[in-house]
């Protein structure tokens, strides 16, 4: 009787109908996570984050916890005289081609809509194949933007550097636009047919994580 009560509480009480496309996506993700390459990728994410954090600190940028042991870090802008400038810095970095998120920091008395921190991580750049030396370069670009966030010419200079950097580390090495078009057409056709499980259209594509 107890088992029946638990089962009925879980379904339909707490769970709805299964989504086959989500189940398939999870299966693919779990399969990828079992591979040695994923372990190496995860280690590189942390190594990259530590390299970026160390470089930011050496450039006078304050980090909450004074470093990182995982995939992300939180910049405290207050020691740089930029209390409540998180949103402005986020937008400036975005103009320069660097994606971060405005974020509150401990004991931040600024509004969460205009906080005093920036959160950034390394999984995306690691997926492109970048390593520690590239993290140092990115950290240097971030520091330039933080100190010159109102200078449009500086932002454009950094953007040019970032564009040059990412062009050397394409998401799918060797894949041209013309080669990608048939895959895109297949996905569009599947969507137009109302087929939700389209993830396998990309099964032959592997980001550069090694």
Which residues make up each language-model segment?
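Conserved PLP-binding catalytic core of the aspartate aminotransferase-like
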Residues: 62-129, 179-180
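Active-site C-terminal subdomain of aminotransferase-like
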Residues: 1-82
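Generic non-transmembrane alpha-helical segments
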Residues: 51, 55-59, 88-96, 145
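Low-acidity, Ser/Thr- and Arg-rich intrinsically disordered low-complexity segments
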Residues: 184, 192, 199, 203-207
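PLP-dependent enzyme catalytic core of the Aspartate aminotransferase-like
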Residues: 112-181
């Amino acid at each position: 009787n107890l088992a029946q009560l638990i089962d009925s509480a879980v379904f339909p009480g707490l769970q709805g109908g299964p989504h086959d496309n989500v189940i398939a996506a999870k299966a693919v993700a779990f399969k990828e996570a079992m591979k040695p390459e994923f372990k190496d990728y995860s280690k590189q994410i942390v190594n990259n984050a530590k390299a970026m954090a160390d470089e930011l600190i050496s450039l006078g940028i304050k980090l909450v916890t004074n470093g990182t042991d995982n995939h992300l870090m939180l910049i405290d802008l207050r020691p740089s005289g930029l209390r409540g400038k998180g949103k402005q810095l986020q937008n400036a970095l975005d103009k320069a081609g660097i994606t971060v998120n405005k974020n509150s920091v401990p004991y931040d008395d600024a509004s969460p809509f205009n906080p005093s921190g920036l959160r950034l991580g390394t999984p995306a750049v690691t997926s492109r194949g970048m390593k520690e030396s590239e993290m140092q370069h990115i950290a240097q670009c971030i520091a330039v933007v933080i100190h010159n966030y109102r200078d449009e010419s500086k932002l454009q200079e950094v953007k040019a550097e970032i564009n040059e950097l990412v062009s050397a580390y394409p998401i799918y090495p060797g894949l041209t636009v013309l080669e990608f078009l048939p895959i895109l057409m297949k996905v569009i056709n599947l969507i137009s047919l109302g087929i939700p499980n389209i993830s396998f259209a990309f099964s032959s594509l592997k980001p550069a994580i090694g």
